[in-house]
């Protein structure tokens, strides 16, 4: 259960792949802390056990993730497939015709099966027999993930409900529960009774667990004594603290930024990742086959994969590498990195094009629901993508992801804001996921952000350019459009109009600020406002008010040069000036 807040259907479609993320996390964390010890002797080695049903097997993501698990030789993962042939709409023969075990064998999994349904048609939940099959699998396939198919009957032995589809998604009902109690020899009128034999068994299991825990503690204590440096790293990771040198790494990088130079924020992001990776050994990640485009490659890092996976492009593969490759599997990438976070003390990230974040969305939503600090890196964030056309040009995505509660959407204006966004995301000891939304095209490094980003970005929105006295209009913008707001403010100033520019890298971070700060940035008395963003304007109306004007894109993109697309769709300084004047005029007319 990787969600823990309610109905299984919420999470089961991702649980299979998340379990694979747990296995990734175990191996990488062991490589950080105890790489030389044979894995069976390491206190950081553990096995991952997952239970799934037909619904999980039917979901496409399970196949995607299973393929990766076999490629990674995740021998510490065992999945028990409860094959009761029932789902909400009835017998799975309607929809699940293939031989599942052969499919998983083709991926590279070890498979076996065991049946609680006896040859004579009787039913016996033979746990000892199942344990023997699992032990056999452990011995036969130490370097393969394992799928054990268990043939079972749903709701056995409940009278009238055994092997009935209604048992899958509905209550058994008082009559059926009473019948089950009677069948098992209990008083049908008595509730919440725990049999003494069951209680004694549970206590015996608890005692066994305590003994195993004691043995592990002894192994861990011996490791700690023998590895003081690694123990210090473990303590830091467990506490969620950043390493010494984190701030300096970012400060040194920012010192290389040249005001006025065009730098794509995806490129700045790649520089930041490499700078902080040098001092954060727990940081690892990659992309869904777009590493070179997303700038998510860690220079000089080994690839997380068995040595035999090495290629001409990626010759350095080992089981403890920190460069991840997911293939074209965005949803799987999101769920595996979720699982890594849940199962280890490491910090993963995953990148793709912003347009393809749609395929990852369900994993992102679940991370927000679980309050885990996954890091999603989404580049190529607007119609400026250009020639690939509207299929690759996100326009509604910023609005739709901002609508997810507890997801922090971050769209920096330039290299300085990008560096400061990463600084704050990690420094705030975040328990929420963050999405870095980044440009394909170069954007100028602004003198204004050089002076103000360090204090401003962490507030979510801040005054980038101001005027003396009360402004006539406030120009709000995010990402690559901040440059046009700054240019428009200069034009307006030349015409005697006082314009304030507010950079808004993260609406979520801005909403965390107190009322006094919000009022200082967006004073209620200034009703003339403009928002500038290369996407639908929906999220901006709460800041625009009654007289504000959005400069936005309310249609799908265009096939053509990216810069020309921006012009053709009205994302220009000239259009911002027009919108500012229109907003001011409406305010004046209303007086």
State what each model feature region is.
Residues 15-19, 58-64, 331-335, 358-361, ...:
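Short glycine/serine/threonine-rich phosphate/pyrophosphate-binding segments
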Residues 218-373, 430, 452-463, 469-471, ...:
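Non-catalytic terminal/interface segments that mediate subunit docking, oligomerization
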Residues 8, 36, 44-59, 77-78, ...:
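A short, small-residue-rich loop immediately preceding and capping a beta-strand
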Residues 152-158, 162-244:
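Terminal amphipathic helices with adjacent charged low-complexity linkers/tails
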Residues 4-5, 28-30, 37-45, 58, ...:
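Thiamine diphosphate
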Residues 392-395:
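Flexible, small-/acidic-enriched active-site or ligand-binding loops
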Residues 1-7, 11:
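Single conserved hydrophobic/aromatic residue that forms the stacking wall/gate
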């Amino acid at each position: 259960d990787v969600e823990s807040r309610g109905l299984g259907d919420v999470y089961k479609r991702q649980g299979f792949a998340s379990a694979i993320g747990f296995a990734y996390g175990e191996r990488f964390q062991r490589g950080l802390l105890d790489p030389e010890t044979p894995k069976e002797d390491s206190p950081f080695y553990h096995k991952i056990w997952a239970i799934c049903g037909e619904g999980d097997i039917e979901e496409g993501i399970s196949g995607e993730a299973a393929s990766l698990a076999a490629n990674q030789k995740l021998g510490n993962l065992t999945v028990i497939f409860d094959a009761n042939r029932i789902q909400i709409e009835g017998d799975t023969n309607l929809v699940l015709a293939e031989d599942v075990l052969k499919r998983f064998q083709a991926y590279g999994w070890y498979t076996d099966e065991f049946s609680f349904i006896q040859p004579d048609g009787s039913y016996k939940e033979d746990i000892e027999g199942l344990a023997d099959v699992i032990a056999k699998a452990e011995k036969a396939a130490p370097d393969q993930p394992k799928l054990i198919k268990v043939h079972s009957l749903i709701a056995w032995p409940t009278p009238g409900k055994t092997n009935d589809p209604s048992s899958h998604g509905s209550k058994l009902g008082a009559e059926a529960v009473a019948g089950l109690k009677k069948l098992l020899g209990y008083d049908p009128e008595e509730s919440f009774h725990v049999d003494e034999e069951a209680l004694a068994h549970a206590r015996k299991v608890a005692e066994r667990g305590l003994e195993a825990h004691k043995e592990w503690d002894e192994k861990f204590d011996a490791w700690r004594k023998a590895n003081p440096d690694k123990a210090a790293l473990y303590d830091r990771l467990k506490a969620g603290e950043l390493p010494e040198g984190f701030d300096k790494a970012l400060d040194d990088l920012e010192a290389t930024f040249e005001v006025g130079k065009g730098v794509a924020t995806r490129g700045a992001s790649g520089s930041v990742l490499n700078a902080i990776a040098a001092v954060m050994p727990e940081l690892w990640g990659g992309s869904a086959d777009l590493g070179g485009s997303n700038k998510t490659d860690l220079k000089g890092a080994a690839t997380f994969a068995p040595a035999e996976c090495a290629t001409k492009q990626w010759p350095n593969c080992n089981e403890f590498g920190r460069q991840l490759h997911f293939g074209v599997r965005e949803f799987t990438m999101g769920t595996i990195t979720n699982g890594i976070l849940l199962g280890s003390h490491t910090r993963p990230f995953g990148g793709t094009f912003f347009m393809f974040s749609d395929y990852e969305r369900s994993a992102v939503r679940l991370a927000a629901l679980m309050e885990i600090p996954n890091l999603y890196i989404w580049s190529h964030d607007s119609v400026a993508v250009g020639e690939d056309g509207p299929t690759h040009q996100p326009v509604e995505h910023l609005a739709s992801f901002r609508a997810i509660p507890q997801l922090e959407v971050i769209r920096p204006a330039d290299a300085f804001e990008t560096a400061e966004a990463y600084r704050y995301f990690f420094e705030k000891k975040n328990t929420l996921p963050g999405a870095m939304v980044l440009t394909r095209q170069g954007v100028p490094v602004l003198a204004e952000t050089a002076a103000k980003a360090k204090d401003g970005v962490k507030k979510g929105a801040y005054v980038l350019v101001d005027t003396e006295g009360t402004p006539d209009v406030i120009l709000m913008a995010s990402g690559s459009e901040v440059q046009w707001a700054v240019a428009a403010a200069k034009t307006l100033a030349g015409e005697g109009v006082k314009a304030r520019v507010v950079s808004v890298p993260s609406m979520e971070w801005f909403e965390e600020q107190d009322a006094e700060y919000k009022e200082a940035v967006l004073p209620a008395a200034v009703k003339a406002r403009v928002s500038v963003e290369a996407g639908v304007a929906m999220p901006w109306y709460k800041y625009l008010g009654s007289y504000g004007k959005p400069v936005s894109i309310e249609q799908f993109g265009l096939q053509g040069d990216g810069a020309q697309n921006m012009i053709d769709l009205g994302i220009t300084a000239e259009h911002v000036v027009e919108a500012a004047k229109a907003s001011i005029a409406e305010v004046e007319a209303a007086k």
